[in-house]
Amino acid sequence: GYLGGIAAPVGYAAPAVGYAAPAIAAAPVAVAHAVAPAAASVANTYRISQTARVLAAPAAYAAPAVAAAPAIGYAAPAIAAAPALGYARYAAAAPVAVAHAAVPAAASVANTYRISQTARLLAAPAVAHAPVAYAAPAAYAAPAIGYGYGGLAYGAAPVAKVY
């Protein structure tokens, strides 16, 4: 996209710190996930696709009906897939927790569920790196029924894989 094929100088690469918009500030998270190997666990694919969708449409927080439709509008899981082991995505994902924390308390139940899941994973990277050993509590066992994820098989997938 540059005239004459001139490469973009290094100065165009901006750090996450210093951006005002939460969705932009968290861009490095999406980049870090996208470059991860495609051999991902189902649980990681679900978590990352959910995070990417929320970051890409922050306005959805103001419209619970839209935010409660996870099947619409997020990138292909195969592209954003991340491995269950072996790279430090949690340090890079810190802006996600900040962006979620700024959401008004009147958020939809679906948003509350997603935010709690993200916060739990960010707060325990050592445990999240060994998802098989982390058994999902019974409270997380029915997201499709209580949070409107639109299908028991889809909604229960992360629980079956365990975090």
Curated annotation (Swiss-Prot):
The keyword Repeat applies. Keywords: Cuticle, Repeat. Sequence repeats lie at residues 7-10, 13-16, 20-23, 26-29, 56-59, 62-65, 68-71, 75-78, 81-84, 93-96, 123-126, 135-138, 141-144, 156-159. It comes from the Eukaryota. GO terms for molecular function: structural constituent of cuticle. The keyword Cytoplasm does not apply. The tetrapeptide (A-A-P-[AV]) repeats found throughout the protein are also present in many proteins constituting the protective envelope of other species. Component of the cuticle of migratory locust which contains more than 100 different structural proteins. This is Cuticle protein 38. It comes from Locusta migratoria (Migratory locust).
